[in-house]
Amino acid sequence: MLNVKPRDVLDFWFAAGWEKWWKRSDAFDAEIRQRFGKTYDEAVAGKLDSWMGEPQGALALIIVLDQFSRNLFREDHRAWAQDVKALSFAREAVRRRFDVEIPVMVRNWIYMPYMHSEDLAVQEEGLGYFARLDNPEVMKSAEEHADIIRRFGRFPHRNHVLGRVSTPAEQDFLDSGGFSG
């Protein structure tokens, strides 16, 4: 898709819905790659930073960097390569109060980079934002992510992809069906 606009990203993402967001689907991943692969590359290169000029653009840019990356690069270190950049944009969006200008039902997507961080202080900061949403399901997920970071200091399910050696406690957690991310 050429000349993608923030609205294109948002319309696509929100039309997809919970089923596609949280269940692995090679077809959905392929659709993101086909429609937004170049958009992702442009975002990584900083060519879409201007989207941060308004709330909807900020939301779209964060989704591209924080969510599309996970669909584009499953089982690849690049799935998390833009997490720092996405978090930086999320923090900027919050600082500029863009989050409160976005409907509460989709606001969690601005906060997702906090949930994806392996830094406990960032996780704790994010919990405050997620608590404001008054969405028990989203809050439960945020708490689960933070608990894993409290326990291990990182997400063990990323270890094999990132070339990290799992500790015995992490391996036990993974073997017992621990969080898969």
Question: What is each model feature region?
Answer:
Residues 1-59, 64-75, 80-181:
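Intrinsically disordered, low-complexity activation-like regions
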